[in-house]
Amino acid sequence: MRSLIQRVKYASVSVDGQEVGAIEQGVLAYIGLGHDDNLQSAQRMIDKILTYRIFDNDDDPAKYGKVDKNVQQVGGGLLLVSQFTLMAKTDKGRRPEFGSAMAPDMAQALFAQLVDYAKTQYLTVATGQFGADMQVLSVNDGPLNFLLEVH
């Protein structure tokens, strides 16, 4: 499982011109599911995202300006967006190969479980719409982007 996380000032997801999910300051997390992923790896990924320290610590003078707080500590939102393209193999040729991505029906079920788990761990969770052609709007803060992997 891979997740591209971004520290954002704002992020939203729209489908057919209708906003389906939005957050203010927080983390926009694109989630890519692979063949070997399961509920346990999904839970590990959510736990990692929620505790990954990518926000500045301006409360402690000794840590001023250092990324030392996680999304929960700053009271930010979490926007989860399914994105199978994160599983692409790009090392050969000029076209991505998506054979590592989980089949859509299985991925939809696992992504729903991932979202459900996230909502049990944190209050401010929003999502896109699985399988839809989504328009994602974000104001990246920093920019700070990290590619997380869980096996």
From Swiss-Prot:
Compartments where found: Cytoplasm
Keyword list, A-Z: Cytoplasm, Hydrolase, RNA-binding, tRNA-binding
Domain comment as written in the entry: A Gly-cisPro motif from one monomer fits into the active site of the other monomer to allow specific chiral rejection of L-amino acids.
Main location: cytoplasm
SUPFAM superfamilies named in the record: DTD-like
Top-rank lineage group of the source organism: Bacteria
CC terms in the record's Gene Ontology section: cytoplasm
Gene Ontology biological process: D-amino acid catabolic process
Catalytic activity: glycyl-tRNA(Ala) + H2O = tRNA(Ala) + glycine + H(+); a D-aminoacyl-tRNA + H2O = a tRNA + a D-alpha-amino acid + H(+)
A Pfam match: Tyr_Deacylase
Disulphides: none
PANTHER family in the record: D-AMINOACYL-TRNA DEACYLASE 1 (PTHR10472:SF5), D-TYROSYL-TRNA TYR DEACYLASE (PTHR10472)
One annotated GO molecular function: Ser(Gly)-tRNA(Ala) hydrolase activity
Protein name: D-aminoacyl-tRNA deacylase
HAMAP family per UniProt: Deacylase_Dtd (MF_00518)
Oligomeric form and interacting partners: Homodimer.
Source organism of this protein record: Psychrobacter cryohalolentis (strain ATCC BAA-1226 / DSM 17306 / VKM B-2378 / K5)
